[in-house]
């Protein structure tokens, strides 16, 4: 069961993109900044970008058909455009957020990070931006995030600070009210349990080897 997170000031009139559409947009934003020579992206390159194991929270495994369906939906919403370069039979895709939502620079970079890595603090966004955008400081991040929140419908929202958190986090609103999955906590627990089981199995194997060696010495 998903539980809605509380937004500072509320989260009304949000967008309604599914997880695949959000990931496709985030990947296009990132690659436009990081690999401009290879942008726009082919479907194959886009799938690879969506399924990266680094800088992705959560890691996803989209198939070509998943990405293609997401592209079709985004094209219908005028958020993505398909291009067929002269002399090429392979279509390429680019986002149109700067046209449709009138955002660029710091605001695009902040939205990119939120779509790819989920809720984050302003400091985390600045630290993770890397070559996507060089924020001058946390204040510039906050300015960009507030500009996204002031759009209509809003593109981002500041979450209420949770117990144990030093700073409030920000989230995108491209999929409606922000949701949290309790299963995520279970996955973390499962990873820890798997590690302990593996360590115990290795210890048992080592003990068996010692017993076998001792038996061989006694029988010899």
Curated annotation (Swiss-Prot):
InterPro entries associated with the record: DUF480 (IPR007432), WH-like_DNA-bd_sf (IPR036388), WH_DNA-bd_sf (IPR036390)
Gene3D superfamilies named in the record: Winged helix-like DNA-binding domain superfamily/Winged helix DNA-binding domain
HAMAP family linked to this entry: UPF0502
Recorded family membership: Belongs to the UPF0502 family.
Name of the molecule in the record: UPF0502 protein CV_4303
Taxon lineage: Bacteria, Pseudomonadati, Pseudomonadota, Betaproteobacteria, Neisseriales
């Amino acid at each position: 069961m998903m539980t809605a997170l509380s937004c500072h000031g509320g989260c009304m009139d949000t967008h309604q993109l599914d997880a695949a559409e959000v990931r496709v947009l985030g990947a296009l934003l990132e690659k436009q900044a990081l690999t401009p020579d290879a942008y726009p992206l082919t479907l194959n390159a886009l799938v690879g970008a969506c399924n990266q194991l680094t800088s992705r929270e959560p890691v996803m495994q989209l198939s070509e058909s998943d990405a293609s369906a997401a592209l079709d939906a985004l094209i219908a919403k005028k958020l993505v455009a398909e291009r067929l370069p002269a002399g090429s039979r392979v279509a390429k895709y680019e986002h149109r957020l700067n046209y449709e939502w009138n955002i660029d620079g710091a605001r695009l970079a902040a939205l990119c990070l939120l779509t790819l890595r989920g809720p984050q603090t302003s400091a985390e966004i600045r630290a993770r931006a890397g070559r996507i955008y060089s924020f001058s400081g946390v204040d510039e991040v906050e300015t960009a995030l507030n500009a996204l929140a002031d759009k209509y419908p809003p593109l981002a929202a500041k979450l209420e600070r949770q117990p144990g958190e030093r700073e409030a986090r920000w989230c995108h609103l491209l999929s409606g009210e922000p949701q949290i999955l309790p299963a995520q906590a279970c996955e973390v627990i499962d990873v820890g349990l798997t590690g302990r089981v593996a360590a115990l199995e290795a210890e048992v194997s080592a003990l068996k080897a010692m017993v076998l060696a001792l038996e061989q010495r006694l029988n010899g």
